Amino acid sequence: MKHSATFSDLATGPQARAVRPLPEPALTYFPDVRSAPSDRDLTAGAAPTSPSAAMVDDEPHIPVLLDRCVELLAPALTRTSTDGSGATLVDATLGAGGHSERFLTQFPALRLIGLDRDPDALHIAGDRLARFGDRVTLVRTRYDGIAAAVAESNCAATGVDAILFDLGVSSMQLDRVERGFAYSVDAPLDMRMDSGSDLTAAQVLNTYDEKALARVLRVYGEEKFAGRIAAQIVRRRANTPFSTTGELVELLYQAIPAPARRTGGHPAKRTFQALRIEVNAELESLRLAIPAALEVLRPHGRIAVMAYQSLEDRIVKTEFAAATASRTPPGLPVELPGHGPRFVALTRGAERADAEEIERNPRSASVRLRALEKVGGQ
């Protein structure tokens, strides 16, 4: 297995810091992540999750829509040979490597370029995919660095055959409570997908002014009580800065009216989503990543993107609509030669997991899958 220069010097990951169960509801549901959905909002008196249960997930992380992703991308990977010889797949959100492992196994000559900003994910996936040897190249980067990663892997001249995005925070990241992504257990307010980046959730809470905090919560969390929450954050931090997820959850229970807490899931879910998106610049990265990915595809190459919340899916939908639109100037009665769409849609709108998959893998309940193929000669 080959590693990029940005990956070779990674440490084995930060040591876990002490965590303790919250005395508040213990849910692990986010509306935008690969975790089991729930329409319940536990009462404040609910039994807390134990640290061992929260930190360790013994259940296997089943890749979402795995068969459908293979079905959509396989034609692009087998144009030359049924074993994937000569083809390159970019897994732009490598995670634990579940999707990549399936592709490498099913197509025994396929080459993989795996991207992830999370050094822990790269180590875990690296171990999982080690048996595939030099067919695998891992690159530590955000997915908007896809063009540079492809160039570094000597594929820039020819392009790649298929690209897969599986967006959102992964189950693996949620399970590591010391990372601060989940609100079910008290832990440091971190939320960085890349432990080497500077901004943390605690810094957002402790340094953004009230107007900026409200904007983050309203835009990225679609939180209707954004102004009220932001005001209480500013008042509280004047006496004691925020340092743990438990402190934030406690404030959210005070800030959000009781009737609103009883519906729509855990009252912390929107604020935690908003902070995570802000800390990791997720939407900005995605807006850059999709056009860059479309550019590095070779003719007849395919791309599949799985989104788990409306903000991400809206960006994907917009970029895909532009890519499949005619380039003939509006108002002309016929399409000009060479001005047709650069891509064709492979899915009718966004596909969702069926009931059977959701029962087998509850993490797939909120997924939206869209896919395109690049028109030949483009």
Curated annotation (Swiss-Prot):
| Annotated S-adenosyl-L-methionine binding sites | 97-99, 116, 143, 166, 173
E.C. number: 2.1.1.199
**Per its record, what are the GO molecular function terms?**
rRNA (cytosine-N4-)-methyltransferase activity
Catalytic activity of the protein: cytidine(1402) in 16S rRNA + S-adenosyl-L-methionine = N(4)-methylcytidine(1402) in 16S rRNA + S-adenosyl-L-homocysteine + H(+)
Q: What is its main location?
A: cytoplasm
The answer on whether this UniProt entry bears the keyword Cytoplasm reads yes
**Bias (Low complexity) ranges:** 43-54
- What stretch or stretches form a coiled coil here? none
Keywords for the protein's UniProt record, in alphabetical order: Cytoplasm, Methyltransferase, rRNA processing, S-adenosyl-L-methionine, Transferase
Q: Which locations, inside or outside the cell, does it occupy? A: Cytoplasm
Q: Where is this region: Disordered?
A: 29-56
> What GO CC terms are in its UniProt record?
cytoplasm
Q: Which GO terms describe its biological process?
A: rRNA base methylation
NCBIfam families in alphabetical order: 16S rRNA (cytosine(1402)-N(4))-methyltransferase RsmH
Per its database record, what is this protein's job? Specifically methylates the N4 position of cytidine in position 1402 (C1402) of 16S rRNA.
Q: Which family does it belong to?
A: Belongs to the methyltransferase superfamily. RsmH family.
The family database entries (PANTHER family) matched by this protein are listed as: 12S RRNA N4-METHYLCYTIDINE METHYLTRANSFERASE, S-ADENOSYL-METHYLTRANSFERASE MRAW
In Swiss-Prot or TrEMBL terms, this protein is called Ribosomal RNA small subunit methyltransferase H
